[in-house]
């Protein structure tokens, strides 16, 4: 970079001050690497002064900048003989040289920052190996249907992954696990198995009623001991449902109803009491379940359902998927090394992590993510699992803060052989062993839900760093925010959740993703009707823009006509376009802030809409190339976010995901012909005043084409705009329009009715002679004068002058109304 002559002189003085010649030449080469000194370079006195300090160009080929510069200066001075002659900086007559060039200052490029739970700050993202990013994500524990809480994490991480890969161009290696060995799975598998066996035995009504009463006893104790209000409310709901189903069956048994009638009530009670009976059956017979296939059947089923849900949500599959059941040998080896390193100990066939020993080490820190939660026994016990917090298990630990690496299996639990006896992995060690096997001693990103920070992720960090004897197993820890349901806490254990399948019955995968994009990935998201309505409106807003641009691009024009002169409006819109692109980039660099990105994109579309509306009002064609560039950019961004399938060239695809046929390019030529034919027919019908043909034309637009997913938009004096829109969307629009028209008609009728009532009331008032208007108010007045004006109140007291004056005004007003009424009678204007 070339600076001013004064700056160059200062640089050269600094170089000349170096006493060692080799170091001086090296410094000169460094300086010259930032400047242009090719033919035509403008010679300065500082160049000459430094040149004269050198006897010859350097022999070292690595100092080629000095060598080229030396020969160039020598040539400008007229060869070797001119090196000691006075320097004439003015070029010889007729010879010109290029002026000195100054590069632009530029701006500091924006760097990606991610909110790192390890620091609770937005840290500059620096992968450990160039552009390669290693990423491990905690997957689901598969014992039930996937719900919107899962969607919150996996859609959010899918968006982050796509942005890192497709926008920032990182090479992302994404790993995810499936937890198919866990206390929840074991308990649920046993309960399902035992309940189905019980149902198949078809217990008589009297036996079922007895069993339900027996099951209710421990359930009632559990209810009385529950302090959490949400959990208590859930248990009370179960209790009430069981009672409501029990009473009809008891009545049926007492009344000796037919077997069919009793059986129907038995089935109702079985369904309502399933949770109650399952817990009771497990407590009495769970230890007798020994077939390992029972414990693998349940997670296999729900894992498959999970993958179907992720595909339906357009969530990319991981590069590697690990299952705990497939990594038991690696987990055993992982635990053994932790013990060998001095951070684990065996106790009664189980192995525990020694948190005190780990925390005392100068190399390690325990509780990196949530240090304030260390010692929280409730959270620690939840992390251990329901089957692992009995008094005998807790007594095996050296400290209550220690957690299980390996659990000795009890009767009724699956088991695998290991050096400490038959058992199964602890929850936290599963992720550590699988991630460590695939990603090694340190990964770039670890992701999971916010509620996994402690104890799960803190324990993962501890045991992994104990294994690798390092302090950097994870560089960036990302946690997605909670999801609430209409402001209420969502919990599978509280049975307060919406499954992904149920959510997809109401809204499309794109609409759900747009809702997530319109919120920060790390903050709480409220899944509610308001949230989804905002997403629907955003989708409609963007889609209308894409449809309008497509219509403009379909207008016939020759090749040269595609490139039109830019007026001030195009220049301004293009300036705004690039400004919004910069704003989008800055937002993505700022912790992948998709909420701001979506608003910037909305603002850009609003500017385009204003531009198109102005052109339409002026009967001028909008600039095709500019609008296409903007629409393609927006499409590109929505593709990156996973809101548009890859095959769509511009805007949202028509026909839904998985449609191989390019519906738009196939049917649009035919629709365009139909539109032009319809316009011609309408024109003739208007001229000939054939109302029936115009009505048929409107019916085609309003009733027939929407059923096929086609919208015709008529604009006075302009060609009909043809748009392909999702059929359901059009039918909803049609229904909404119908409701709006009905509401308008209802309001009009209501206004007419009110007006009629007001006129009737006014007429009724006008009919009253002023002399009679107060006579009926005996609850207010006791005496009246000859004109009917009150003089005394009900107690016989004479009215004050102020009261009398007020009544006099009312009397005179009524007198005027009554005269109008008499005049109307005389004129015959009353119907």
Swiss-Prot record:
Q: Which cofactor does it need?
A: Zn(2+)
The gene from which this protein is expressed is Cars1
Q: Where does L-cysteine bind?
A: 139, 179, 456
UniProt main location, coarse: cytoplasm
Keywords, A to Z, come to: Acetylation, Aminoacyl-tRNA synthetase, ATP-binding, Cytoplasm, Ligase, Metal-binding, Nucleotide-binding, Phosphoprotein, Protein biosynthesis, Zinc
Tell me what this protein is called.
Cysteine--tRNA ligase, cytoplasmic
Q: List the disulfide bonds.
A: none
Q: Where is this motif: 'KIIK' region?
A: 184-187
Q: What class of enzyme is it?
A: ligase
Q: Where is the composition biased (Basic and acidic residues)?
A: 736-762
Lineage of the source organism?
Answer: Eukaryota, Metazoa, Chordata, Craniata, Vertebrata
Native source organism of the sequence: Mus musculus
List ligand-binding residues for ATP: 492
Task: Describe the reaction catalysed, as an equation.
Answer: tRNA(Cys) + L-cysteine + ATP = L-cysteinyl-tRNA(Cys) + AMP + diphosphate
User: Tell me, how does this one assemble?
Assistant: Homodimer.
